[in-house]
């Protein structure tokens, strides 16, 4: 496989970023399996074609907006071995991704949360882990927060930055919209589900980052893979949000990136080949380049 350069990776990311502006990230958490029954059902039939690199057609994916960079990197890497296959990505949110896999309008649904117990007929396969970074304005004096402080801040018990080591000023809470996988992950882990006193509820990860960048009194949360240098990610109980701390579990606010496949509908050869590529050790560096933590390496 050719080396994926920063220039080529950013080119692909730019292509999907425009679509992601209209998106949302899906719903709540439960359990995710280590393998996909539906995805594996056609693996044997696609091996020869996949190895030869002569597959063609489209693989329809969609769902989580937080997985944008990961899907962009995987798509570019897969094109190196299967140039005849097109992988489409519709950033509609995790809930829509799961629904798409369930009703077979998508080959592979994308979710930034584990499947819930009542989401049946589909299987979730974790391809990566993602830390949910707690972000503040770059001018904020606050460097570290505890989970308990976050709970009190987002429920309105703590309302002034001076109470957590910052300058005097009313805390502005910025979050995602109801149904977002990022929101569900944050609220479940911090134990603030449905009790947050948001000043703004935004429909995309990038919008949250932009809002925090623009307001010195704001605090929000965003996927580690999406956080750049326009905002500051604080440590949580002294632990930085990074690949190492997410992987070893010391960073507490994290969630899975999941491929969702239909249990009753075998994947097409090209979709199976993409699934196998994305869950192989060959994809680990691509996933890491995209800012997430690979689980297969």
Regions found by a protein language model. Name each.
Residues 2-4, 26-30, 34-297:
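Exported/periplasmic ABC-transporter solute-binding proteins
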Residues 6-10:
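N-terminal export leaders
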Residues 14-18:
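Hydrophobic helical h-region of N-terminal Sec-dependent signal peptides
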């Amino acid at each position: 496989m050719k080396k994926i350069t920063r220039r080529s990776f950013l080119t692909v990311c730019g292509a999907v970023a425009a679509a992601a502006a209209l998106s949302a990230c899906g719903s709540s958490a439960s359990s995710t399996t280590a393998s996909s029954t539906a995805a594996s059902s056609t693996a044997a039939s696609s091996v020869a074609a996949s190895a030869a690199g002569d597959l063609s057609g489209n693989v329809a994916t969609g769902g989580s907006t937080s997985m944008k960079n990961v899907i962009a990197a995987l798509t570019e890497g897969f094109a190196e071995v299967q140039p005849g296959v097109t992988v489409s990505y519709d950033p509609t949110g995790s809930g829509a991704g799961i629904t798409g896999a369930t009703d077979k309008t998508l080959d592979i649904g994308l979710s930034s949360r584990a499947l819930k117990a009542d989401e049946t007929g589909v299987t979730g396969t974790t391809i990566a882990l993602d830390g949910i970074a707690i972000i503040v304005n770059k001018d904020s004096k606050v460097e570290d927060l505890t989970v308990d402080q976050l709970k009190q801040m987002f429920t309105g018990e703590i309302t002034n930055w001076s109470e957590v080591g910052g300058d005097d000023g009313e805390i502005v809470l910025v979050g995602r919209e109801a149904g977002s996988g990022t929101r569900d992950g944050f609220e479940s882990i911090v134990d603030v589900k449905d009790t947050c006193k948001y000043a703004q509820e935004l429909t995309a990860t990038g919008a949250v980052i932009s809002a925090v960048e623009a307001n010195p009194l704001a605090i929000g949360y965003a996927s580690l893979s999406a956080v750049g240098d326009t905002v500051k990610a604080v440590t949580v109980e002294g632990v930085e949000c990074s690949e190492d701390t997410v992987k070893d579990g010391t960073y507490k606010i994290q969630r899975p990136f999941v491929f969702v496949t239909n249990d009753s509908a075998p994947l097409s050869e090209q979709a199976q080949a993409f699934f196998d590529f994305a869950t192989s050790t060959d994809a680990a560096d691509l996933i890491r380049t995209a800012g997430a933590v690979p689980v297969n390496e």
